A protein has these predicted regions:
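Helix-coil boundary/capping segments in enzymes
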Residues: 1-154
């Protein structure tokens, strides 16, 4: 392992495996999740083309700690993978989607000793609901900020 430096990786993305497994089971919002080669997942939103596969360190938050150690880094700030923010979903489904994604992200980093920190995501179709989710993520979950897409459907 490299000597630990006082560095923080401030730009990382991930999608918790348990979130994708839950969506695969429930088909939340009509989203399809299929197994991909190598243990990953392919997500398809209703009416959209399948996304590129999510696999490896994108899904495995324990692997991230090993990667940080190998880089001599102290912490990593993770935002949900932009491809799965769920902006394609109608407002009600989108709010459930981001709430479950934010909760799963916090569960995934809980055992990291605060070496992994998280940004929330928000569904932007209903600004008041997005503001409530941001407040919940900051005050109840302890997320450090939020990451939103720059290109919205429609």
């Amino acid at each position: 392992m490299s000597a630990m430096i006082n560095g923080i990786d401030v730009h990382a993305h991930g999608v918790p495996r348990q979130f994708l497994e839950e969506v695969k089971r429930t088909r939340l919002g009509g989203v399809e999740v299929a197994a991909a080669d190598g243990g990953g997942y392919i997500v398809t939103f209703p009416g959209c083309k399948p996304l590129r596969p999510a696999a490896g360190i994108m899904l495995d938050f324990t692997q991230r700690l090993g990667w940080l150690d190998g880089q001599g880094m102290q912490q990593q700030l993770i935002g949900p993978w932009l491809d799965v923010h769920g902006q394609e979903l109608p407002p009600a489904d989108g709010q459930v989607w981001v709430r479950q994604l934010n909760d799963a992200l916090m569960e995934s980093i809980a055992g990291s000793g605060r070496r992994l920190l998280a940004h929330a995501t928000l569904h932007l179709a209903d600004p008041q609901a997005a503001a409530r989710e941001l407040e919940r993520c900051a005050t109840k979950l302890g997320m450090t900020g939020c990451m939103i897409p720059t290109d919205l459907p429609g």
